[in-house]
């Protein structure tokens, strides 16, 4: 059994019931551990509530997943990095899996009302790719497993989204940006030797990875191509 649920759905009674079932993974819709963000999003819990639930589940030896979001009202990149640090500190040697989702504006929601009133500005696809790529890189460095970046495409989702970074390849581009951060972090100016398995990650989507590497390193696209060798 594998399931995803709201962090407030766990009490001692529920935890006791779970012992009777072969649960392989419990995922929590954490969204954020920034209390201001949680309050603005009306999530109905505080960061301390999430931490308590995760610690209880890990103590019972469950595999736990945390679903984090980017681009929420009043959220910053720094707060998401702080979320990762907090999760790393409470997970210890236990396995904790992450999903990273962008905030999208759906029809007939409170967020749509904020958008129409000019009180919320969704992320662009480019900013969402960069933000989630940074989160991915930091999460990997902290030892997390990343199960997914971006939402699974469904007809109902496609028909409901009215604004925000909705792109079927958001995850692939975010991982490409994460790779670029790793490459330039180890060697800012190259030349770089890159595994062949990453060719599509760099060259896909109109050379998104190559262009990102050029942007970060300050070299032209042609100079970047000359500095890369695939092994």
Regions found by a protein language model. Name each.
Residues 1-61, 65, 69-100, 107-126:
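Conserved non-cysteine loop/helix-boundary elements of the Radical SAM core domain that shape
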Residues 101-103, 151-152:
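Histidine- and/or cysteine-centered catalytic micro-motif in compact active-site loops
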Residues 110, 117-231:
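Auxiliary Fe-S-binding modules of radical SAM enzymes
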């Amino acid at each position: 059994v594998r399931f995803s649920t709201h962090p407030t759905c766990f009490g001692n009674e529920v935890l006791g019931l779970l012992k009777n079932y072969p649960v392989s993974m419990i995922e929590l819709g954490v969204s954020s551990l920034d209390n201001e963000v949680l309050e603005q999003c009306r999530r109905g819990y505080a960061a301390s509530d999430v931490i308590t639930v995760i610690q209880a589940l890990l103590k019972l030896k469950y595999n736990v997943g945390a679903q984090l979001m980017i681009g929420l009202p009043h959220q910053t990149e720094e707060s998401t990095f702080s979320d990762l640090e907090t999760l790393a500190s409470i997970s210890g040697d236990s396995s904790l899996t992450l999903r990273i989702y962008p905030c999208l504006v759906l029809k007939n929601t409170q967020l749509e009302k904020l958008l129409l009133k000019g009180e919320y500005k969704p992320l662009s696809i480019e900013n969402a790719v960069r933000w989630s790529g940074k989160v991915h890189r930091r999460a990997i460095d902290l030892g997390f497993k990343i199960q997914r970046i971006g939402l699974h495409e469904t007809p109902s989702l496609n028909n409901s989204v009215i604004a925000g970074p909705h792109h079927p390849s958001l995850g692939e581009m975010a991982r490409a940006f994460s790779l670029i951060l790793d490459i330039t972090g180890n060697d800012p100016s190259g030349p770089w030797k890159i595994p062949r398995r990453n060719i599509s990650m760099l060259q896909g989507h109109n050379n998104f990875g190559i262009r990102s590497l050029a942007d970060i390193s300050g070299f032209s696209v042609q100079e970047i191509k000359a500095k890369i060798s695939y092994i």
